[in-house]
UniProtKB/Swiss-Prot annotation:
Annotated NAC-A/B domain residues: 33-97
Stated name of the protein: Basic transcription factor 3
Pfam families: NAC
Organism name: Arabidopsis thaliana (Mouse-ear cress)
Single Gene Ontology MF annotation: mRNA binding
Disordered, as annotated region: 120-144
Protein's gene: BTF3
Length: 165
């Protein structure tokens, strides 16, 4: 390039007068549609099949349930891959439990009863442990005197302190 063309291009980029900062190039942001297209092409390569007529999907994680209502579900049994697409809602297990009970079979009901018993044992165990911990913390502040009172202990220390002075 010759010098004249270069100067002409530089002048078009400059926003102010001579000596001002040139404008910065605006970054082009990557959209989510490209990621979605890449994901769909990968899923197609795996060979997932769409599973129709699924009204709800619940994913249990710790004490939280991630719930999808009317999701798009795809699966590839050979690749051990399940894809759940849709808008998720995060709910607590206690909130969603009444809705789920009607969908459980007899085997799952037994498991649910066992879980409920474990939760009750943990809750009662935590209550007892908390009260015992509070009593132990209170005991740390107060010295234990066995067979004597505070007055007699103070009288015994006073003559010993006077004798050593």
């Amino acid at each position: 390039m010759n010098r004249e063309k270069l100067m002409k291009m530089a002048n078009t980029v400059r926003t102010g007068g001579k000596g001002t900062v040139r404008r910065k190039k605006k970054a082009v942001h990557k959209t989510n549609t490209t990621d979605d297209k890449r994901l769909q092409s990968t899923l197609k390569r795996i060979g997932v099949n769409s599973i129709p007529a699924i009204e709800e999907v619940n994913i249990f994680k710790d004490d939280v349930v991630i719930q999808f209502i009317n999701p798009k579900v795809q699966a590839s049994i050979a690749a051990n891959t399940w894809v759940v697409s849709g808008s998720p809602q995060t709910k607590k297990l206690q909130d969603i439990l009444p809705q789920i009970i009607s969908q459980l079979g007899p085997d799952n009901m037994d498991n649910l009863k066992k879980l409920a018993e474990q939760f009750q044992k943990q809750a009662s165990g935590e209550g007892n442990a908390a009260s015992a911990t509070i009593q132990e913390e209170d005991d740390d502040d107060v010295p234990e005197l066995v067979g004597e009172t505070f007055e007699t202990a103070a009288e015994e220390k006073a003559p010993a302190a006077a004798a050593s002075s």
